[in-house]
Amino acid sequence: MSNRDQSLATPYLQFNRSQWAALRDSVPLTLTEEEIVKLKGINEDLSLDEVAEIYLPLSRLLNFYINSNLRRQAVLEQFLGTDGQKIPYIIGIAGSVAVGKSTTARVLQALLSRWPEHRSVELITTDGFLHPNKVLKERDLMKKKGFPQSYDMHSLVKFVSDIKSGTHQVTAPTYSHLTYDIVPNNNKVLEQPDILILEGLNVLQSGMDYPHDPHRVFVSDFVDFSIYVDAPETLLQPWYINRFLKFRQGAFSNPNSYFHNYAKLTEEEAVGIASQLWKEINGLNLKENILPTRERASLIMTKSANHAVECVRLRK
């Protein structure tokens, strides 16, 4: 099969790093180095080059899509003869634990809010829609946290449905990685943002991923543009272990941390525990529930060592 035939056989356009970077097209970098440091995750080296070469072209593409969506809404309003209500544009970000979804979400939030239109951009993680630990313990699901059955999918779907229905005020529960649980009485209130970035393991999942809980509507039905942050497991596992070691030195040392006991481990013991957690929980969830959703994404960002994106695939 020729390269042209192979290109026609895939639903994606593929770009290497330099090809993708060229699509920035003179868009100015509106973030300072100090701001970028605040946006990066505990386990990542986020550079100015990464933002300029990967995220600026992506923010430019998203700006085109968002403007196109606004024009489509205007056409519908003209046809109906109505003043339509404000409908947020939803960007979904999926991928494995430790791949850097949260950093991607924060960088895009910062960049999209700095476009000349000065749009309001909210960021919500689906962690807030996990069942509380009390419920997970009752259902013997603590070791399945992050798996489809650990989420209150009905509440999550209602949340995105209300957002897309133009509801003026919508609330979302919040999750604490310190206590490893939902924070009671601490809902975040969203008031019709222009853009909602929804980040989580499960934003691309559909009916086939929830055979235990049949319902007809899914988060992915409401997402306008979806991004899958990808990396080979040979990188993901060491990233996860390294992140665990950094938490051991930092967050785990807090007496209020759910994982406070891990702070007392030797490095060798910590690596052993993290490797076991990856094998039994996060790696398993990746293979069974997250990776199978990758090809549903509008765009796939593939990372290499040091969390640098080396390839971008964009759905035609």
From Swiss-Prot:
It catalyses: (R)-pantothenate + ATP = (R)-4'-phosphopantothenate + ADP + H(+). ATP binds at residues 95-102. It is found in: Cytoplasm. GO terms for biological process: coenzyme A biosynthetic process. Keywords: ATP-binding, Coenzyme A biosynthesis, Cytoplasm, Kinase, Nucleotide-binding, Transferase. It is an enzyme of class 2 (transferase). It holds the Pfam family PRK. Its EC number is 2.7.1.33. GO terms for molecular function: ATP binding; pantothenate kinase activity. HAMAP family: Pantothen_kinase_1. Belongs to the prokaryotic pantothenate kinase family. NCBIfam families: panK_bact. This is Pantothenate kinase.
